Amino acid sequence: MSEPRPTAHYHLPGLFEFYDFYRVFLPLFRRHRSYFYDWCDIGSIYGAPADCLWGGGRVGSGTHDPREVLALMQEYDIEARLTFSNSLLRAEHLAEEACSELCRLFAASGGPPNGVIVHSELLLDYLRKTYPSLYFVSSTTKVLTDFALLRRELARPEFRYVVPDFRLNRAFDQLRALPDAYKAKVEFLCNECCWFGCADRRACYEAVSRKNLGEPGPECRCAAPDAAGGYRFSRAMENPGFIGVDAIQNTYLPMGFSNFKIEGRELGSALLLEFLLHYMTKPAYHLHVREEIYLDNMLDLF
């Protein structure tokens, strides 16, 4: 009897930020499943609403009603993850009512299990005690670039998944040597555009955390050689840490890894669509998906 084929679980950006996009894409994904690779699925969608004190990584911009967001996830049996990865939280911030209300809502959903992406140990301890039905993801904002630290994080039972820094994506010898239980917890950040040699990544995340807290502090000025151009998917593909669809299917899945995070909460929905075309859609159906989402014979670009 042949071994079951492994499945890649994608963790997609924009739970709140791209609600309107997913309201169109998810019915398409269900209705025309043959357009998409049968070896992958949507493991979760993550994000945070605007003005979210516990938020981190990016400044949230979503404003849609959380109940409608959760209802959409339940309708399509997809896990929702709250991105609460602020690294600078203090005890007084735990009383923030809007974030607590989100946790109460998502913890009591009764559908697929929902999670929280966290950085702060203080917040992790509080959420574990207060909302035990939620699971937890160790955030890439911890910038785990030392493999020994990654392995230690994977050993922590409180985390269901751990997102290492993208610069460990090609540490193949060490990744291959991980036990299966650890491999199941690794969630690779695939499409990072950050400069591979960046020494300011932690400071950048801390600047975002301060901004979400409404506190003054230095802005993080990107020192990458091509920073002025902003995010370009074509440039991300040239990053030494990039994981593309071929590598997922032919390298990472055979090694025993199955969880892949796509970044992009702060980008536009047109780029999100390009990510989904690259990672999930059979090339023969790229145009079909574009036509279903936005492309018609009256669309003008200029």
Which residue stretches match the model-derived regions?
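Active-site pocket-lining/capping segments in soluble small-molecule metabolic enzymes
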Residues: 2-149, 153, 159-302
